[in-house]
Amino acid sequence: MRIDIALVNLGLFESRTRAANAVRDGAVFYGDTQITKPSFDVENPDLISVRGAVMPYVSRGGLKLEHALDTFHIDMTGRRMIDIGSSTGGFCDVALRRGVAHIVAVDTGTDQMHSSLRDNPKIELHEQTDFRYIDDSVVGDIDIATIDVSFISVTKILDKLVTLPRLRDVVCLIKPQFECGPELSARFRGVIRDENVRAQTVENVVAAFGAHGFDCRGIVQSPIAGGSGNIEFLAHFVKKH
């Protein structure tokens, strides 16, 4: 039996996704051996243990936003937020715990938001929705945006983002694998290991934000890797008024 399945069967995690993430984060042991592959075959489930801090949020993404808010000293109390690329809700989870007043959660997918967040009255969920085409009435009072998009460059949404009338802060997850272009991404097989390429993608994103009237106040490497081990970055932008 796979160890991620065994973890769920033992009641240690509520889903295979969370179990697999814990394995990748090095929190799961089989006997005295640390296991890092969710596909690891288990013969005796009784030898499985979870050590260290268990994931405090509904997804690993929460650790990324937590790090950004702490690094950039951003207070979420009473803020009205839009979470672009909300997915399971890791960013939403962090924001709620830090006193956000309201969240517009937007994602092109469906049925991804964690069950513990889906019915939260502070979350206004817009699934199967492309942020670029969301109605202006939905985002009129938004003052902070968090961004975690995949398979497109974040620069593609800036024309819409800049139109939000009350927007001030933006916390953006920069993913070099989606910013470098399809040719480079294919050359590196989706994992950008070249530091120069990563640096250039960050520069390109900062320049694009600047061209749309945003100041970059800080950039920090994500505390955890993204999919397939990609190094990612978090940036804080402030809209000029």
Predicted regions and their residues:
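A basic, amphipathic helix-loop patch mediating RNA/tRNA/ribosome contacts
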Residues: M1-D46
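Conserved beta-strand signature within the Rossmann-like core of class I S-adenosyl-L-methionine
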Residues: R166-C180
